[in-house]
């Protein structure tokens, strides 16, 4: 599988952009600030439905525009399909396949699988739990068709439940005579949905971690040395899911115990939004004991493990994205990731300096030239729009004169 052409409209810093890729290694070279990371991020969003750089769609849309569009021509096994997503600054994101009917973006997540390697990957080990949850969400979205929809539904339910808890906490918007009972009744309904969706998400995440564990341990040992033992440990907030065959009743009792605390704080105190994934090295938490080099290697092994699992489960080689990673790595790790990249169907690499371009056959794209070409196209479009507007104005005046 590979992307042959990518087009962006109003995506971050790109007003309009069209570029062609080839199978194998593609390198986007240009100084910082030209927008090369935005290009490969657009591929990540098309693939996974989200970006590792932001939790909101708003930053993905060029300022002053209501939406951004990403279109990709994808070739796989001799067939070509066109995937298009429309990212709304506010509201639902939509998608089309081959110009067909509009559908939710979540419905095409994973159809163009990709795995990204970025400078922020070390935070998968050293960063906060939200970083690791985002990784789990992207991984599960690639591997489990229903996951993206379940996550979206859970996020909505969690917001509704939190809003009711806040009402109970500060009394805002509650009718003195009847309102509190109505809020409590609503809270009971939302809590039931919160538990049902939360249990499913927890099970899905646990299954994904189970798929990743063996290749992660094996790949880390091959990169760092056979004597090093790395492992993944799921730390779910709903730990009842791991302890009971029917965890919903136990979780419901847990909510009853913490109800006063939730009302006092006005927020959901347990649930998948508080899950974590611990990376362990030699039976110790890596974020506390591993060196920077060991953290980099663990993050690299985790992404390589995800690639291996997606390849095996989906029977397709994901597109590999290497975003500005070579400047961050020593020669040994550069070699390891290049050996991995050269075996893949398509690799998109961003580099700032020409000296960072890896040796070997590659399709190199000059991002500065692409930016200049894009600006010329924007100017042509603006001029044409002005001409059309002037023509309409003249036509209108002529009609008025005749009448």
Regions from the language model: what does each represent?
Residues 1-31, 45, 174-319, 328-332, ...:
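Conserved NTPase motor "head" modules and their coupling/switch loops across ABC/AAA+ ATPases, GTPases
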Residues 323-325:
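Walker B catalytic acidic pair
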Residues 6, 68-74, 91-98, 277-282, ...:
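Short polybasic amphipathic segments
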Residues 107-111, 119-196:
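A conserved P-loop NTPase coupling/switch region
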Residues 36:
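Conserved lysine of the Walker
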Residues 72, 346-353:
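Structural recognition of the conserved hydrophobic beta-strand(s) that form the central parallel beta-sheet
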Residues 44-131, 135-147, 215-218, 247, ...:
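Nucleotide-state sensing region of NTPase/ATPase domains
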């Amino acid at each position: 599988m590979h992307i042959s052409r990518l087009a962006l409209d109003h995506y971050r810093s790109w007003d309009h952009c069209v570029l062609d890729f080839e199978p194998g290694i593609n390198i986007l070279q240009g100084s910082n600030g030209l927008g090369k990371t935005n290009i490969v991020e657009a591929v990540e969003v098309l693939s996974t439905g989200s970006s590792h750089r932001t939790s909101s769609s708003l930053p993905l849309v060029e300022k002053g525009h209501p939406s951004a569009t990403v279109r990709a021509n994808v070739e796989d096994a001799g067939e070509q399909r066109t995937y298009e997503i429309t990212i709304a600054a506010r509201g639902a994101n939509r998608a089309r396949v081959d110009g067909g009917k509009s559908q939710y973006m979540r419905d095409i997540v994973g159809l163009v699988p990709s795995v990204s390697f970025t400078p922020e990957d070390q935070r998968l080990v050293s960063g906060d739990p939200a970083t690791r949850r985002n990784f789990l969400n992207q991984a599960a979205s690639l591997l489990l068709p229903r996951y993206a929809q379940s996550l979206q539904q859970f996020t909505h339910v969690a917001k509704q439940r939190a809003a009711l808890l806040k009402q109970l906490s500060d009394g805002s918007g509650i009718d003195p005579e009847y309102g509190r009972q109505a809020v409590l009744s609503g809270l009971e309904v939302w809590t039931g949905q919160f538990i049902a969706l939360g249990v499913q998400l927890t099970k899905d995440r646990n299954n994904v971690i189970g798929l990743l564990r063996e290749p992660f341990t094996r790949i880390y040992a091959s990169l760092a040395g056979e004597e090093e033992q790395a492992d993944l440990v799921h730390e779910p907030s709903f730990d009842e899911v791991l302890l009971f065959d029917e965890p919903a009743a136990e979780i419901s009792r847990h909510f009853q115990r913490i109800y006063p605390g939730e009302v006092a704080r006005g927020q959901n105190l347990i649930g998948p939004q508080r899950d974590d994934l611990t990376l362990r090295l030699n039976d110790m938490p890596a974020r506390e004991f591993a060196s920077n080099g060991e953290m980099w290697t663990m993050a690299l092994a985790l992404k390589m493990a995800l690639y291996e699992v997606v390849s095996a489960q989906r029977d397709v080689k994901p597109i590999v994205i290497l975003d500005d990673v070579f400047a961050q790595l020593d020669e040994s790790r550069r070699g390891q990731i290049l050996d991995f990249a050269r075996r893949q169907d398509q690799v998109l690499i961003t580099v700032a300096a020409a000296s960072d371009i890896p040796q070997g056959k590659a399709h190199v794209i000059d991002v500065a030239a692409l930016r200049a070409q894009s600006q010329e196209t924007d100017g042509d479009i603006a001029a044409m729009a002005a001409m059309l507007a002037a023509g309409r104005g003249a036509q209108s005046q002529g009609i008025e004169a005749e009448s």
